[in-house]
């Protein structure tokens, strides 16, 4: 879409933060209004993360107005809320391309702009990186400032508290801003608290505070009395005791939608020494009533008509794999009260809404705490229950040691339902489920299953749930199932694949939901097609049979080739001294960028045409 200067006259004056800082303060509320409307107009036409950005418009304007970005370094946690930041930093006219192949990255990305200090996508990394950046800036000696913006969900993660604990110890000059959109602005976050915040952040208070500490530092009883008096005064009105205990100077809460008030507070805090903490209250979806009322639904949106206030409904076609999992979960829980389901803040995405309502006492959302989720599941298993950890492939990476140390070594029967395995599409490099087979396959006694369709997915979940000799995992993709008939649940024989088609010289060993594409290739090339089903343990007998009866083998998977299922097949053949040629087809050795799943599979040669071309070129 082209930028409409007449519709956004103030925003038209701002294509960089340098231009923003030339505007008079009085025009900033109007700029915020135009920025919010432009965000609505753009995202409704292109799709993308939506409600979070609406809530950070005033904060974004205030930060870039007060701080000398990009010289001063601004770090956004996760990045869902960073669309206004992109618009104000030279990417205004390209915002309609966000999350599209070749377009703007969905999150702050170092390779895209000098304003994007840290590439992000996963949560709770900002403060740790910010401390390192602040320490580097201090050693540089150019008075470069560091600011981290983190949400109320991301700050619950252990990594954020580990970082704050470290900051309290080494005391770098930095500002952490908590964007708290859990609730609307309440009465006690009004004029009085804003006035108090400006007083507490002002030079007079800070001078008195630090001066008093120096004067009385040698008199322990008076020092302690001073500390307690200060805590008592601030504790009456400031809910920041936890952050103060971690070593931060806490300011807030303040109204995150008062751009002029934010500017005053940020200017007061800009030159304070040591770690500072500013708590702002915002409303997710601010300025667009449907998003304010339902921020979860409007968190990430497809293209929609903003005048309707509704998102387009599903066509009612095939269910998603997440829905298949959710239905199986409810069905199984109704029969077994030992089932416990765990998610790290991904209830909707993992298909667990219905389960959470039907079985609230057996549903555990542990927040953004993947490490805790896995070890919590280990504890439930020790206690005699049957835990299921529903988690995205890209987020399970964050709990790898817990899978190893707390589950696998102890042979605990924890089932991992791994959603978003393989190419996920528009969220790009940070969210592709490219590595789970590689990092799980090397864990001793782990059972790993890759269904080729929704019926097999259900059977594998059932098999894993009833496997009691250690952990198991079922990995399935983002997107809809293929429409096969669902048969009664039964346990699959562990480590056994099945031949789907008999051919001649070539055998294709398929792992997972690329099966429809592999089937087209097998038909075209008159190849044998095998649904391997298990990545671990591999069906070694079937692999050796295929090697003995065919001139060449091809493995197919939507996982990194390095260390993946195909690598396992290679290892089996080498161990048995079988010199049959093998072509491994999978994800290449680079981070897969954004684009639709169809676009990326075609580009990577993982659709039927691409696979066939690769095989023919290899055989030539």
From Swiss-Prot:
Keywords assigned by UniProt, alphabetized = Isoprene biosynthesis, Magnesium, Metal-binding, Thiamine biosynthesis, Thiamine pyrophosphate, Transferase
Any single GO CC term annotated in Swiss-Prot or TrEMBL for this entry: cytosol
Locate the residues binding Mg(2+).
Answer: 152, 181
Instruction: Indicate the impact reported for residue 431 to A.
Output: No effect on activity
- Which residues of the sequence carry a binding annotation for thiamine diphosphate? 80, 121-123, 153-154, 181, 288, 370
Question: What GO terms are given for molecular function?
Answer: 1-deoxy-D-xylulose-5-phosphate synthase activity; magnesium ion binding; protein homodimerization activity; thiamine pyrophosphate binding
Q: Name one GO biological process term.
A: terpenoid biosynthetic process
Q: Which cofactor does it need?
A: Mg(2+); thiamine diphosphate
Q: Does the keyword Transferase apply?
A: yes
Keyword Phosphoprotein assigned: no
* Reaction(s) this enzyme catalyzes, per UniProt: D-glyceraldehyde 3-phosphate + pyruvate + H(+) = 1-deoxy-D-xylulose 5-phosphate + CO2
* E.C. no: 2.2.1.7
Which pathway or pathways does this protein act in? Metabolic intermediate biosynthesis; 1-deoxy-D-xylulose 5-phosphate biosynthesis; 1-deoxy-D-xylulose 5-phosphate from D-glyceraldehyde 3-phosphate and pyruvate: step 1/1
Copy out the cofactor comment. Binds 1 Mg(2+) ion per subunit. Binds 1 thiamine pyrophosphate per subunit.
Temperature effects on activity: Optimum temperature is 42-44 degrees Celsius.
What family does the database annotate? Belongs to the transketolase family. DXPS subfamily.
> What does the UniProt function comment say about this protein?
Catalyzes the acyloin condensation reaction between C atoms 2 and 3 of pyruvate and glyceraldehyde 3-phosphate to yield 1-deoxy-D-xylulose-5-phosphate (DXP).
Under the subunit heading, UniProt states:
Homodimer.
Name of this chain's protein: 1-deoxy-D-xylulose-5-phosphate synthase
């Amino acid at each position: 879409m082209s930028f409409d200067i007449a519709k956004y006259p103030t925003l038209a004056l701002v294509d960089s933060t340098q231009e923003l800082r030339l505007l008079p303060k009085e025009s900033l509320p109007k700029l915020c209004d135009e920025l919010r409307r432009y965000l609505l107009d753009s995202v409704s036409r292109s799709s993308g993360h939506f409600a979070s950005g609406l809530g950070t418009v005033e904060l974004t304007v205030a930060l870039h107005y007060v701080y000398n970005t990009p010289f001063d370094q601004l770090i956004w946690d996760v990045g869902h809320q960073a669309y206004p930041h992109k618009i104000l930093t030279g990417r205004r006219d390209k915002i309609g391309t966000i999350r599209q192949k070749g377009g703007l990255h969905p999150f702050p990305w170092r390779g895209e702009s000098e304003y994007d200090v840290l590439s992000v996508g996963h949560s709770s990394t900002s403060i740790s990186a910010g401390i390192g950046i602040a320490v580097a800036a201090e050693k540089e000696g150019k008075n470069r400032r560091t600011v981290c913006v983190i949400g109320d969900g991301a700050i619950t993660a252990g990594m954020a508290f580990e970082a704050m604990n470290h900051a309290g110890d080494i005391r770098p000059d930095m500002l952490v801003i908590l964007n708290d959109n859990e609730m609307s602005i309440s009465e006690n976050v009004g004029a009085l608290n804003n006035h108090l915040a400006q007083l507490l952040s002002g030079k007079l208070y800070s001078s008195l505070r630090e001066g008093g500490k120096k004067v009385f530092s040698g008199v322990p009883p008076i020092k302690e009395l001073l500390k307690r008096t200060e805590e008592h005064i601030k504790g009456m009105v400031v809910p920041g005791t936890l952050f103060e205990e971690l070593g931060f100077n806490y300011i807030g809460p303040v109204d995150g939608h008062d751009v002029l008030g934010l500017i005053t507070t940020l200017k007061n805090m800009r030159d304070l020494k040591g770690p500072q903490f500013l708590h702002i209250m915002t409303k997710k979806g601010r300025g667009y009533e449907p998003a304010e009322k339902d921020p979860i639904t409007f968190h990430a949106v497809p293209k929609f008509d903003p005048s309707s206030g509704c998102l387009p409904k599903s066509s009612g076609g095939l269910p998603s794999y997440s829905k298949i999992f959710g239905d199986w979960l409810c069905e199984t829980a109704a029969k077994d009260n030992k089932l416990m389901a765990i998610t790290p803040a991904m209830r909707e995405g993992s298909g667990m809404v219905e389960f959470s309502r039907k079985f609230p006492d057996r549903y555990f959302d542990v927040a953004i705490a993947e490490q805790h989720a896995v070890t919590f599941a280990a504890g439930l298993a020790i206690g005699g229950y049957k835990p299921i950890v529903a988690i995205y492939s890209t987020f399970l990476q964050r709990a790898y040691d817990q899978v190893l140390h707390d589950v696998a070594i102890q042979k605990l029967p924890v089932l991992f339902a791994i959603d978003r395995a393989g190419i996920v599409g528009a969220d790009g490099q940070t969210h592709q489920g490219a590595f789970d087979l590689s990092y799980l396959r090397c864990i001793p006694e782990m059972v790993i299953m890759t269904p080729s369709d929704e019926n097999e997915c259900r059977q594998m979940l059932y098999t894993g749930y009833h496997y009691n000799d250690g952990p198991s995992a079922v990995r399935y993709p983002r997107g809809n199932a293929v429409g096969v008939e669902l048969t009664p649940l039964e346990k699959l024989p562990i480590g056994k694949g099945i031949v789907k088609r008999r051919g001649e010289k070539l055998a294709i060993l398929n792992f997972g939901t690329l099966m429809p594409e592999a089937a087209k290739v097998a038909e075209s090339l008159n190849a044998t097609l095998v649904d391997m089903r298990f990545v671990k343990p591999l069906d070694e007998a079937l692999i050796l049979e295929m090697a003995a009866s065919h001139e060449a083998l091809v493995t197919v998977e939507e996982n990194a080739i390095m260390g993946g299922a195909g690598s396992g097949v290679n290892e089996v053949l080498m161990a048995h001294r079988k010199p049959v040629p093998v072509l491994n087809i999978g994800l290449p050795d680079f981070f897969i960028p954004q684009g639709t799943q169809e676009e990326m599979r075609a580009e990577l040669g993982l659709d039927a045409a691409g696979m066939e071309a690769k095989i023919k070129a290899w055989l030539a």
